[in-house]
Amino acid sequence: MDTKLIVSASPHVRSEETTQSLMANVIVALCPCVVASAIIFGMRARLVTAVSVVACVAFEGLYCKLLKKTNPISDLSAVVTGIILAMNVPVGMPIGQLIIGDLVAIVIVKQLFGGIGMNFANPALVGRIVLFISFAGSMNKWVFPDAAVDQLSKATPLAVADPSKLSLLDLFMGIHGGVLGETCALAIVLGLIYLVATKTISIAIPASYVGSMFVFYLIATHSVHEALVAVLSGGLLFGAVFMATDYVTSPFTLKGKLVYGVALGIVTFAIRYWGSYTEGVSFALLFMNLWVPYINDMTRQTPYGYVKPAKKEAAGK
């Protein structure tokens, strides 16, 4: 029996869940963020989201048609990628640039590596990083959700010199600048509750990631307020709930998930606290995506009754 594709010890639990049903649950969980972005940033947020989804589905369909492969549109994974990438860009992101990110996510990161389940990193994550590196000006042009300063560039909470002056309520409700999906913590929490309630994801990764970040900032700043600001600011919550929990690029054991989450917290904290870049979530996720195979190997469950083979004696003895 070929065991190359067996990544966990038996017994293997089977269920009636399909890729389509899991992706559908993720889409439902993303709806609060999509609705919140439309309320906070207006009609263009809907346009950005719609274009991103259509582009991802179209690129996947075109790629499969050209290579005469079965179009996997029914699994809804391209829709999820399109929504997540849209939630990772500012409302003013030029449509042409956004479509480039969709192309990278679907064709290069997902399909060229063999399709769903074969990608080395989260497609939407890599698409966001490519957009950030290639179009830094567009990705760093924040719009503050206030009619009086509509379409004006505004600093995000992470760039504020004195975090103690920031309102936790404003951060929780999304009354601050940022990308579409990260601003409203309430919407993200609602999505998390749905995903956990439907057993689509485990709470282990979001809890260990966000919890470790809170502890690290509490130790570093000696301030509960500043630690909460760090948790509610930037892409931490959105990344922890919708990107770090990606099935393909996250560990499969509970121990592995906890190790992964804490490691994400360490890397993100290091980038934010000591680095020159105020965010850090995207690069932390990409870095840790590469370590997932090793985490899986180190935390692999030992089969019941397994006996480690004795080392062979040296020849001649």
Regions found by a protein language model. Name each.
Residues 1-22, 271-317:
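Cytosolic-side transmembrane-helix boundaries in multi-pass membrane proteins
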Residues 1-57, 315-317:
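N-terminal signal-anchor module of multipass membrane proteins
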Residues 77-78, 83-149:
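Membrane-interface helix-loop-helix junctions at boundaries between adjacent transmembrane segments
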Residues 58-70, 106-118, 188-198, 241-250:
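C-terminal ends of transmembrane helices
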Residues 42-55, 92-101, 171, 175-185, ...:
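Structural signature of hydrophobic alpha-helical transmembrane segments
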Residues 120, 124, 206, 228-236, ...:
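Loop-to-transmembrane alpha-helix initiation sites
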Residues 117-189:
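Long hydrophobic alpha-helical segments that form multi-pass transmembrane helix bundles
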Residues 28-31, 54, 76-84, 99, ...:
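Hydrophobic alpha-helical segments embedded in the membrane of multi-pass proteins
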